[in-house]
Design a protein with these regions (language model features):
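Glycine-rich Rossmann NAD(P)(H)-binding loop
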Residues: 65-67, 93-100, 127-135, 145
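Conserved Rossmann-fold NAD(P)-dependent oxidoreductase catalytic core, especially the SDR/UDP-sugar
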Residues: 1-38
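Active-site Tyr-X1-5-Lys
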Residues: 22-25, 31-61
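Proline-glycine-enriched beta-turn/loop adjacent to the NAD(P) cofactor-binding site
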Residues: 18, 60-66
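Non-catalytic, hydrophobic alpha-helical segments
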Residues: 109, 113, 129, 190, ...
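Mid/C-terminal beta-alpha module of Rossmann-like enzyme folds, strongest
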Residues: 112-175, 211
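A conserved pocket-lining segment of Rossmann-fold NAD(P)-dependent short-chain dehydrogenase/reductase
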Residues: 69, 78-108, 112, 116
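Amphipathic terminal alpha-helices
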Residues: 176, 185-219
């Protein structure tokens, strides 16, 4: 649309997601957890197909709140769980006990994205922006529950998902694929992809600030 309108721009910066780069088995078709991932990937394809469009694609893992201020978007996976935990509604969770998440604080992601985007050599390239290491989901939950002064939920098998009330599942179902798998993006390779592990603040300390900010806003 911008091109048809005759607008001049230096380049498009597309924020995709690292989850479009799932490792596939031989002869396995690319699949997506949801339409969010699918549309992010389709947008990537469009940028690569259109001629004379300068672009840079950024693929973050799970973006959390600001590690300094604790500000957190209401659409975040972390926010949804904090809400349920704070109300003592999440009593069971059907995930593996060793599940882990790759979380990057939004300020760390944005700072690195701006640094990459300021360089001409990043035009036409795709970058993975993820944390140096995953964080155990159990550790995150236990820390959150301790800060919120509530009992942590019980981890149950996936077969026991029917034990969770529908009104709770409807809030977390879309996030289940992410907390059921321990994706380590830094070990993935794909032609034309640059893996970047920017300096990131500690996820647990970030969680402290997020919950402190959340609790203060509810007073």
């Amino acid at each position: 649309l911008a091109k048809k309108a005759g607008l001049k721009f230096e380049r498009f910066h597309h924020i995709s997601t690292a989850y479009v780069n799932r490792q596939l088995r031989k002869n396995e078709k690319r699949s997506f957890n949801n339409t969010y991932e699918q549309t992010k990937f389709e947008a990537e394809l469009l940028f690569r197909q259109i001629e004379n469009i300068p672009y840079t694609i950024y693929r973050p893992s799970i973006v959390s709140g600001n590690s300094v201020t604790g500000n957190l978007a209401a659409s975040s996976i972390i926010y949804k769980f904090i809400i349920l935990l704070s109300r003592n509604l999440l009593r069971k969770l059907p995930i593996d006990s060793d599940a882990s998440l790759n979380i990057i604080p939004v300020n760390n992601f944005v700072n690195k994205m701006l640094a990459i985007g300021s360089k001409k050599e990043s035009i036409g390239k795709t970058y993975h922006l993820t944390h140096q290491k995953n964080t155990e989901f159990r550790a995150l939950l236990e820390q959150a529950c301790s800060l919120l002064n509530v009992e942590p939920p019980e981890f149950v098998s996936r077969q026991q998902i029917e034990d969770i009330p529908n009104q709770i599942m409807q809030h977390i179902e879309v996030f289940m694929p992410y907390i059921r798998q321990s994706q380590k993006f830094e070990f993935q390779t794909e032609e034309g992809i640059t893996n970047i592990l920017p300096p990131c603040d500690n996820v647990i300390s970030t969680l402290h600030n997020i919950i402190h900010n959340f609790s203060s806003s509810k007073k």
